Amino acid sequence: MNEYGAFTEDNILSLHFLDGYDGKFYCVDYSTDDFRKAFRPWLFDQNALYYKYFTCLKKAVCADLGKYTPVRIGHLDLIKKYRLHFGFTKPLDEQNCRLIKEILLIMRKQGRQLDYNMSGFFKPQCREMYPSRFIQGMADVLGVPFIPGSDSHSVEDLERAWG
């Protein structure tokens, strides 16, 4: 961040890679095949996998990334991208809710913002915005501001969300 931060207008901190069952890092949103390969032991325990993800996200939020530390946190619950494919449809358990609350309280204390975007709606195996309505409600109650974002990686995504 220190090397390139001065050349950017806006940065978003997000978690895309997580250590898998074999200790290697895998992209959580690349494909269902990679997700299955990486997180096989957790595929029957949605809340354990989500807890692993949110624990890593908390470390990222707490990390000192220097002068250009991103103010905004993107798709806080990206781990749910393939939720319908893997049957991850249960509500978050109490342990995950507590951890998310801790993350949001840290964000509030740091003056951070939560990126709010619709891209998950357009993912056929997700069909939910990032973050979920539940997390949005927690953030609102705790006073963490939302910033509308597109999180678009293509013109087509922008047109669908805002066109």
Question: How should each PLM-predicted stretch be described?
Answer:
Residues L76, F86-G163:
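Charged catalytic cores and adjacent phosphate/nucleic-acid-binding surfaces used
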Residues M1-M107:
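Extended substrate/RNA-proximal surfaces in nucleic-acid metabolism proteins
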